[in-house]
Amino acid sequence: MIKFPVLPKPLPLGEVSRNVTERARPLLEDFSMIYDTLNNLPNYLGVSDNLDTVIEYIMARDITTLPAGRTRIDGDKAVVTVSTVTPQTSDKALFQRHDNHITLETDLDGSELFEVSLAELTPTKPTDEATDTTGGTAGTSIAGMLCEGRFALYLAGEPYKSGLKAQGCGKLRKAVFSIELDPDEEDETEE
């Protein structure tokens, strides 16, 4: 039987607390990726210092106006890359895994499908240390659709595919936030 997470109750607007670690961190320990609306991003404050930086960055501006290319939010700890992507079919895409950072993706214009695997990644390419990316194959466990106003947060070590073709959808403009693990999170992934 699949066990679905019970998300924390959203806080009233204006009462977002930085002390939600006790509510949100168990989601990251017991479950896979997070899929939610951008309006709910403040509910995830307190999970990670570097994720907090990205959440505050997103909530403070109209991200649809971000320029194409790479923008540093906090040095190399938090970076956003905005690009236009031509979606591909799932059979043509490899799963990817990042061991030293989490990835938050949102579509600025258009829609795409994504897949996440709860299984181990079988590498088919050597790890690119510069981008912390390992490509390979894995069984699909979760699939969904990403569109404007929604985000997917892929956890470190979690195989996923994104930028997959959704029926009736063409090119899309997306923002990909690469977020380094906090030092205490790195210790947890090494255990």
Labelled PLM ranges:
Residues 151-153, 169-186:
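A short hydrophobic beta-strand segment most commonly corresponding to one strand
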Residues 145-164:
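Conserved metal-binding segment of the jelly-roll/cupin
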Residues 2-82, 92-97:
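A short, N-terminal "cap"/entry segment at the start of jelly-roll beta-barrel domains
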Residues 99-112, 118-120, 127-133, 178-179:
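Short, conserved beta-strand element in jelly-roll/cupin
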Residues 75, 91-103, 120-125, 139, ...:
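A short beta-loop-beta micro-motif enriched in histidine and acidic residues
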